[in-house]
Amino acid sequence: LNHRFNFEGLDVLMTHIGGYPGKYNKRVRMIFEADPPKLFICGHSHICKVMFDKEYNFLHMNPGAIGHHGFHKVRTMLRFSVGEGLIKDLEVVELGIRGNNVKTNMN
């Protein structure tokens, strides 16, 4: 399933399985060819990665995995702010080794 929305002037498309620049699946590639977003967020690979897609002119984000199950070694997420259609203060938050309960202060 896709979720497309506008937040603070930023056109965002989120989906679970989407791929990476140059290797998108057909479903999302068709969306990009018709009307690309400014921010594309997808997951599935459990690999935390942020990159700019020059072909479709948007920022691609995969927050990694925050859960305790999977092949990832470190639990990750992305934190950022949005204002006036721009992404600001992007950071990777590491929540510890997969399988360990780690208390964090997420203020």
Question: Where do the PLM segments sit?
Answer:
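Core catalytic region of metal-dependent phosphoesterases/phosphodiesterases
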Residues: L1-G9
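Structural motif
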Residues: L10-V12, L39
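Short, flexible loop segments at the rims of nucleotide/cofactor-binding pockets, characterized by
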Residues: T15-P21
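Conserved beta-sheet core of the metallophosphoesterase superfamily
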Residues: G22-L86, L90
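Charged phosphate-binding loop/patch that engages nucleotide di/tri-phosphates or the phosphate backbone
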Residues: G83-N107
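Short, flexible active-site-adjacent loop segments at beta-strand->alpha-helix junctions, enriched
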Residues: G18, I66, G96
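Active-site-proximal loop/helix segment associated with metal-binding centers of metalloenzymes
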Residues: E8-L10, G70, N100, N107
